[in-house]
């Protein structure tokens, strides 16, 4: 929690630079990595998150920003409120609505808007409330939550769905153990890769 009451969750290997107290007419922080922000509303003092590639300006909202030092790709995703996103090198400015994300390609210098990726906030949540969530979407949520890559075999019935609360466990294997029978899968974890196949396959 920052001095103004803003709450920030940082993904691993992320650095957030911020002052002990926010002085002047702005609340300015610098992010390298991925952070989830629940910004305390203050219309007189905008909250600005600066990264290597883009800047996000807000008054009070909930959003996720992912941007590395190399600046090749930066993604800002809005969950609640309104944010203003602009590139650091004249790529333009975009105002996002909830459920949208702005993506900046550092190679082409293009700033585009698209629907938010499912489970974008999952990496910092302690539980997921799932409702008729198909396997492909569920895998995206788990990838975000555990920072892994999930490979789905062709024999998996991706139309199958899962509903209900799912508490985040210490690792992805522990979570998959809870749901594998419900969605008819088996899995194998090799490093940071997870291979999912049908439970009926040999």
Give short role names for the model-derived ranges.
Residues 1-202:
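A residue-level detector for the "anchor" residue at the start of short, highly conserved motifs
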């Amino acid at each position: 929690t920052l001095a103004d009451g803003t709450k920030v969750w940082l993904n691993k290997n992320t650095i957030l630079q911020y002052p002990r107290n926010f002085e002047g007419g702005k609340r300015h922080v610098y992010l390298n990595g991925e952070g989830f922000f629940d910004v305390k509303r203050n219309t007189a003092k905008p909250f600005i998150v600066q990264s290597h590639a883009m800047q996000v300006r807000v008054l009070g909202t909930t959003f996720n920003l992912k941007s590395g030092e190399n600046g090749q790709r930066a993604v800002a995703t809005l969950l609640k409120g309104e944010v203003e996103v602009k590139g650091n090198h004249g790529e333009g400015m975009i105002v996002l609505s909830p459920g949208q994300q702005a993506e900046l390609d550092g190679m082409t210098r293009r700033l585009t808007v698209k629907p938010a990726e499912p489970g974008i906030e999952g990496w910092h949540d302690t539980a997921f409330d799932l409702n008729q969530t198909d396997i492909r979407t569920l895998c995206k949520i788990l990838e975000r939550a555990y920072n892994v890559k999930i490979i789905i075999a062709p024999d998996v019935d991706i139309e199958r769905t899962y509903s209900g609360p799912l508490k985040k466990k210490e690792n992805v294997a522990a979570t998959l153990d809870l749901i594998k029978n419900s969605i008819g899968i088996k899995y194998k974890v090799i490093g940071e890769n997870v291979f999912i196949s049908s439970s009926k396959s040999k």
